[in-house]
Each structure stands twice: as structure tokens, then as C-alpha cells.
């Protein structure tokens, strides 16, 4: 590594952490309906949305009403997007005259984007019209992220409220999250990307002649507006097939840096939003410390692994400087590895290089980031939800060790809360191990693997881990566009999304009804170094031990077999 590489890592951390406290405070004020500097502009738009839809933002909902509203909204979005993808050949803004999607692929794509997963078994420039990209996928990029933010706010209210039977209003939370939290930042980033050279037009594809004399079609389209929210909303689905490795999607080192920062910016800010809700910023600092520790450990391991010389090339006597297979030279090894860690630490899934080409242990870091439940920053809203669940599990374990009824911020954790926590622990194993085992045991679906041996198993394991974790990235050698995998991965995506959201809302409703007991000297502190250590170990044990056998069969076996 050179000085530039260290400077890149430092710039990434500074740009990520410096604005996070301010944004966190802003998001808190926005979601609670307080007046902000954007209110004169967006306030009339917000009120118009309520008037047109007949929503009273002051009418609060119980956790069940909140959940039903969320499910109804997501179902409607799925149906509309599925129909749009199937019928895109008949719809306008399709200058390339692309036909409608095959039904299983359309089903998978709709499920993927509605749930903020953005798993893509297609190439955007060859499969989707501008209308499908702009009205179908980009809209879902906004509202799926807003859904996650709304669920987080509901959980924050459940923890902070006393003897309450309501969690807020889903429709108001969705509207505020979209208008105030996501839209303004996305516009700023989109303008920056256009300045850097990302297309934003409705032009036909351009036929060009290469230096070698071959014909080439250069894709166009409204890319910048979709790419900005794909990063900020931790969606990750690329406008073009190779995602942010494409020179039109990520043309410069500056666009690479700011797209990289935007992956984790809102999740980092929401940690401070949580502190404002519970009126204790020490909780935010503890959670952020745990997230940063896990991120930096994963980044260090991944960078070390990726800079190891290839044993096969050593035997051949080839001089090695940096492994560039599957990487864009304009980003280099460090820029690609840093992105792979950030995109899997969040439920983003965008890539600026091919994860399939990472060295085995670097690929394992990406897998582990997802297997722990996308809690290392995680997706917008849902990532912090997962981290708070791990906080409650750590508190429960601490209570068992000291022989006291576990409590968090004055709320006692009793049998009902523990049952809900256990239910969320089953989500990743069911989606990854059960569905993945079914796919691996059948000869037809297993044929999607392009590489025999441990790496082929890693390809399949990565696909089902990514789907269940609502990440969306993939080892590119896995041929996912079959009816079986389209439907099975859709099921994994559904389990991974709503298997977390519904128990979280039920938990929020249960906690909201509890009274808050004053914390005494015997209360277990949840803001010191001891608790941060306990929380980190809990995350690694719950995620690591569950999936250790599969990791041993995949990336660990590959690492050993290659002679690293």
C-alpha cells in the first residue's frame, strides 16, 4: 500500500463521520414533524400529499396498524412494479424497443427492489427501458429506504415512550423520510455525478467505432438520478450491468470517493438520531464505536488478504505489485477492497469491482459482513434496527450472567421480548442455510455454479446470503437467471426483509407499553467500553458460530487449497 491508499481511507472516514452528528439531529427533527430550514419549501408539498391521500399525520397507529399499512404499501408497490416490468414493451420511454421481462425475472426484480435488496439477475442497459428504470426502480429506491427509516423511527419511539399504545403514523413517517431525508441529499449527489460525467438524458444509445475498428453501442439514460439514491438509500442496484465499475456510472476517482461515502452516510447519521430519541447520546457513541470496530477489523483483514501475492504466480516467477484481476485500474486495489467492505457492511450491494475475483479471505469478509445480519451500519433504518436487536440480546446475556432481570434504558426485557428476539435470530439461518441447502442439493439449480470446488460453493452461499441479508451483491460467476433461483431467491429476500421488520414492530409495540424504571447503581451500563466489547463479541458469536461450518467449506477451504 502507498500513501495514496492511506489518504483514501482517511478521507473516507472523515467524510463519513464529520457530517453524521448534524444529519442525525436533522433526521430526528424531520421525523418528529419539527420545523427545519427545508420547511418553507417542502412543507406545502408535505401537506399536499396528506390532503390528496386523505391522511391525518396526527392520527397515531398501534404496532399492528403500522405493520398492516407497511405491508399494504409494499404489496401495492410490488404489483405496480411487476406489471410495469412485464409490460414495458408496450409502454413509452423505450427508445431501444426492449421487450417485457420474463415473468420469473420480473417477479424477482420487483421483489428485490421493493425490499431494498436490488438483487439483479439482468443487465440494466440490455433489459430495462428508461421508464422502468426511472419510474419503476428509482421510485422503489426511495420508498424502500423510507420504509426502513420509518421502521427504525417506530422502534425508537417504542423504546423512548412510556405506557403508550402507538408508534406514530406510517404514512406520515414515509412522507417525511422521502421528502426531507432522502430527496434533498439525492438531488445534491445527482448534480455532482452529472458534473463528473454520469449521463442524465433520454437519448438513444450511441453507435461508436472503437480504436480497433469494431462497432460499439454506448448506453445512455437517466442514470445520475438513480445512482444517487441507489447509494444513499443503500439500495445498490446499478443502472448499468456492471454497476459502479461502469465508466458511465462511476467515471472518476472523485465520484468513486463520494459514492463510497454515501453508502454509509445515512446509516451513520441514524445512529445519532437514535441517541436523540432516547435522550442519551452515550448510547449512540457506544453503538457507533461497535460499528466502526467491526468495519475497521473487516477492512484490515480484507486489505491484508487482497494484497497477498498469488501462490500460483509466485511459482511461475511472475512479479506481482497489486492484484488487479476483477478491478478497475482507475480505482486500484485499495479503492475496490474498501468498497467491498462498505457495501456489505451496509445492505447496499453495489460494486466497483468483481467480488468473484477477490482472494478467498477478502470474499469471506464480505460474506461475514452480511451473515451477522447487516448490522455493521447496515441499510437505511433496518441496519440500526438489527444493531439494536443485538444490543438487547447482549443486555439479556449480561442479565443472565449477573443474575438480574435484563433491562435497557429502563425498560425490562421479559418473555415476550425475548421470544421476538429469538425469532429474528432465525431469519438468516433459514434463508441462507435451509434455502441454500435446497439449492445446493438439486442438480439443476446447482448447475448455476460456474466454478467447481470450494469457490463454486462460495458462489451459491454468497447468493443466498446476499438475498437474505437484503444486500444484492453477488459473485458474478453465479448464473442466477433461472426460474428456480429467481423464485427461491425471491423467497429468501422476502424472509430477510419482513422476517425482521414484523418482529421489530411487535417489539416496539411491546416496549412502548412498558413503564420506564429509573436506572440505579445496580443497572448494567450500556454505554461504556465493557458493553461495546460485549456487544461486539455477541454479534460475532451469534453470526460467526452459526455459519462457521459453511465458511469452512467455502472460502476457508479455498484459501488453504490455493496455498496462501
Swiss-Prot record:
A Pfam family: KdpA
Subcellular location as annotated: Cell inner membrane
GO molecular function terms listed in the Swiss-Prot or TrEMBL record: P-type potassium transmembrane transporter activity; potassium ion binding
Superkingdom of this protein's organism: Bacteria
Keyword annotations: Cell inner membrane, Cell membrane, Ion transport, Membrane, Potassium, Potassium transport, Transmembrane, Transmembrane helix, Transport
One cellular component term from this protein's GO annotations in UniProt: plasma membrane
TM region positions: 7-27, 67-87, 135-155, 179-199, 258-278, 286-306, 382-402, 420-440, 487-507, 528-548
Cleavable signal peptide: none
Keyword Transport: yes
Membrane topology: Multi-pass membrane protein
Family: Belongs to the KdpA family.
Role according to the record: Part of the high-affinity ATP-driven potassium transport (or Kdp) system, which catalyzes the hydrolysis of ATP coupled with the electrogenic transport of potassium into the cytoplasm. This subunit binds the periplasmic potassium ions and delivers the ions to the membrane domain of KdpB through an intramembrane tunnel.
Complex formation: The system is composed of three essential subunits: KdpA, KdpB and KdpC.
Name this polypeptide is given: Potassium-transporting ATPase potassium-binding subunit
Source species of the chain: Pseudomonas syringae pv. tomato (strain ATCC BAA-871 / DC3000)
